[in-house]
Amino acid sequence: MTATAPTRAASPWQLRLFGTTAPRATILIRIVVGGIFLSEGIQKFVYPGELGPGRFAKMTPLPNPAAWANADGIFEIICGVLIIVGLATRLATIPMIVDMLGAQVFTKFPMAVHQGVWAYFHESRPEHGQLFGLVFLLIVGAGGWSLDALLTRRGRSPGQGPT
């Protein structure tokens, strides 16, 4: 006979952070939003000249564009996977919201200045879609078909092992 460790109930802040009341269909938004970040992160390493350090060197005034591009790619891969599986989803959205705002500032706002507002609106459609998807996930959580939901149903928060 093996003894099982009792489970501790998740604290109120853990439930707010990892809990979700969103419908199961939220998985569709997670797959699209997380999948795009995963794909874009991988492509920064597969095509470094066009999408990674080379692109960052051309489009951003940041020092050491290679380090920024690589960090961005790593964050997109890690957060993309977390969003897809629904683990720490709300936390994973935060750096990606910053990422999308950075994309707006460094790549799209200059377009509005030089080519006009309509060119900006046209070219920034993907960033706006990603940004609104991320804000949605930040507000409602991962949904019923997620690791966040599974862990909070069991009374544990992610990262909390048996006691």
PLM regions and their residue ranges:
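Extended, low-polarity transmembrane helix blocks
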Residues: 1-47, 66-74, 78, 85-163
